[in-house]
């Protein structure tokens, strides 16, 4: 197997902006692109390989063909043949809805699906004008929650953050959240497209209709635990990995490289994904496969990868994630 790039799946949304297409240097015309699905095995939105011997095959077909060689033997068994992560870039020109995602148990019971634990890495904040919501800032009961939804005051219970490039937020299933206007970010999440929309600022869609809310479904999906700080704190460093998140669903680190680095994955029984956010680099694997990676691109390295040599062109910043 060889390092895989996929064709992006662009999603126009009510709240989408204009940054994704130039960021990814795409030659296409599409308005209000809110999301680019970089690597996806969501039914109906399976990523298609862009180049090489497997060009034209989608991720589901790759899973059927390569199995543990692609994702790792234990991952293949654990996730029953499904690719476990969904990778996105998200550009919010307007606020997204206040929402929550169910955990594995509730999602399987209701939707025969995995839950959705996710994380965000802020790439740009529109000159300091971006914010988001993450978690409850005060204790509320399910009944109080229902009352606040009814009175359109749920935002008063949420922790609001002004964000800067490099900020990180970990969002376990059950945590209420919303991406705010001005945020441009990378999102790593479980392979799930289940979202319970809690509040949508009384917006109407292109047909003039209020968007559907999931008030009852969300009530018992919410984790009502309150924390003092929902931001992930870390110390940025150059030319070494900085771990951001480690949870049962993914481990993610950030790299800011100015010099060549050799990555040893020989003991890792998992695929590895690089999500490039700034600059460019050339990556060569242990079989001699060489691939160029630039800002806006995501690359999937199969579980058969033993080691990688990463040579930055000047400086490069990317996220590394695996299961």
Model features per residue range: what roles?
Residues 196-268:
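C-terminal amphipathic alpha-helical segment
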Residues 87-88, 96, 118-121, 160-161, ...:
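His/acidic/aromatic-lined binding-pocket segments of jelly-roll/cupin-type domains
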Residues 262-263, 279-284, 298:
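Short beta-strand segments in beta-sandwich/barrel cores
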Residues 139-151, 269-282:
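Short, basic/aromatic beta-hairpin or loop at an interaction surface
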Residues 148-196:
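Loop-centered beta-sheet repeat module
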Residues 158-170, 285-304:
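Short acidic-glycine-tyrosine-enriched beta hairpin
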Residues 1-140, 200-228, 252:
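Transition-metal
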């Amino acid at each position: 197997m060889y390092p895989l790039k996929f064709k992006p799946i662009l999603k126009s949304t009510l709240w989408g902006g204009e940054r994704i297409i130039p960021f990814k240097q795409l030659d296409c015309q599409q308005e209000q692109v809110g999301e680019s699905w970089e690597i996806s095995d969501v039914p109906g939105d399976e990523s298609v390989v862009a180049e090489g011997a497997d060009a034209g095959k989608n991720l589901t077909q790759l899973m059927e063909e390569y199995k543990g060689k692609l994702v790792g033997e234990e991952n293949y068994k654990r996730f029953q043949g499904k690719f476990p992560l969904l990778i996105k870039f998200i550009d919010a020109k307007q606020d997204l809805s206040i929402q929550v995602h169910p955990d594995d148990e509730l999602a399987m019971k209701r939707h025969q699906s995995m839950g959705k634990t996710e994380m965000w890495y802020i790439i740009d904040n529109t000159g300091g004008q971006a914010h988001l919501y993450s978690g409850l800032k005060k204790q509320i009961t399910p009944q109080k929650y229902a009352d606040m939804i009814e009175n359109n005051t749920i935002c008063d219970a949420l922790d609001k953050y002004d964000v800067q490039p490099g900020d990180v937020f970990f969002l376990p299933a059950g945590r209420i959240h919303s991406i705010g206007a001005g945020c441009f970010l990378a999102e790593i999440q479980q392979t799930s497209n289940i979202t319970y929309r809690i509040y949508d600022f009384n917006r109407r869609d292109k047909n003039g209709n209020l968007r559907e809310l999931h008030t009852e479904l969300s009530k018992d999906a919410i984790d009502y635990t309150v924390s003092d700080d929902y931001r992930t704190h870390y110390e940025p460093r150059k030319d070494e990995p900085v771990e951001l998140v480690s949870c049962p669903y993914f481990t993610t680190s950030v790299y800011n490289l100015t010099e060549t680095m050799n990555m040893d994955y020989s003991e890792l029984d998992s695929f590895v994904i690089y999500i490039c956010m700034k600059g460019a680099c050339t990556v060569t694997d242990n079989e001699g496969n060489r691939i160029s990676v630039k800002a806006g691109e995501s690359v999937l390295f199969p579980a058969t990868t033993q080691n990688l040599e990463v040579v930055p062109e000047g400086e490069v910043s990317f996220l590394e994630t695996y299961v």
